[in-house]
Amino acid sequence: MSNNSRHYSAIDEAILQGQAMLETLFGKPVAQRENPAKGLSQPALTSAEKKQSIGFMRVNHSGEVCAQALYHGQMATAKNPAVRALFTTAAKEETDHLAWCQERLEELGGHTSYLNAFWYTNSFLIGLLAGLSGDPLSLGFVEETEKQVEIHLADHLRKIPSNDLKSRKIVEYMQQDEIQHGLNARSSGAKELPYLVKKLMAFHAKVMTTLAYWI
């Protein structure tokens, strides 16, 4: 029986979610796909350029921490096995993003956000609430989240130094994946979220991106 269709007890689910949190926050993520920046010849960056790139890649890494938490929260409460499978697949692809961002941060000499445990906990609870609202709204939450993430990534591509080829290549690949995740959610029956919920999501994202850039 596949993991997607297997029934877990509440204790099993809690153990699985705890393991996922620890792996995300303290483990070294392993990508299933090759880093798109691998093999690129990277020109030298000035100190100012490197500092700027570190800030944006730290934000992107924290965004992927949030994505892991959101998807795991939604997986834990999904009613339809097909919806749970969709979340599981998306979470695996987001793990690739997490690994790529972490690898690039290390190359740049930067650190991940010191607030990642807070981001994860907060996002996991949001994912649980989204899932408990029913699969259509949970899928709508994914669609809206990915729309907002794609906008953030497009903004980063305008601001990351033009000669930071590796960071830009990673962000470009991430952007395409996020667009596809949103389309997948829509085609699976996503229900549009209320306007106020969208605004609250944007505010939450603004707080995270602002703080993670520096801390």
Swiss-Prot record:
EC numbers, comma separated: 1.14.99.60
Record key words, sorted: Cell membrane, Iron, Membrane, Metal-binding, Monooxygenase, Oxidoreductase, Ubiquinone biosynthesis
Bilayer topology annotation: Peripheral membrane protein
Domain of life assignment: Bacteria
Pathway recorded for this protein: Cofactor biosynthesis; ubiquinone biosynthesis
InterPro entries the UniProt entry points to: COQ7_proteobact, Ferritin-like, Ferritin-like_SF, Ubq_synth_Coq7
Cofactor(s) in the UniProt record: Fe cation
Cofactor note: Binds 2 iron ions per subunit.
Pfam hit, one: COQ7
Reaction catalysis annotation: a 5-methoxy-2-methyl-3-(all-trans-polyprenyl)benzene-1,4-diol + AH2 + O2 = a 3-demethylubiquinol + A + H2O
Gene Ontology CC: plasma membrane
Residues the record lists as binding Fe cation 2: 94, 146, 178, 181
Residues where Fe cation 1 binds: 64, 94, 97, 178
Swiss-Prot/TrEMBL GO biological process terms: ubiquinone biosynthetic process
Protein family per UniProt: Belongs to the COQ7 family.
Function: Catalyzes the hydroxylation of 2-nonaprenyl-3-methyl-6-methoxy-1,4-benzoquinol during ubiquinone biosynthesis.
Protein name: 3-demethoxyubiquinol 3-hydroxylase
Source organism (scientific name): Coxiella burnetii (strain CbuG_Q212) (Coxiella burnetii (strain Q212))
Gene name of the record: coq7
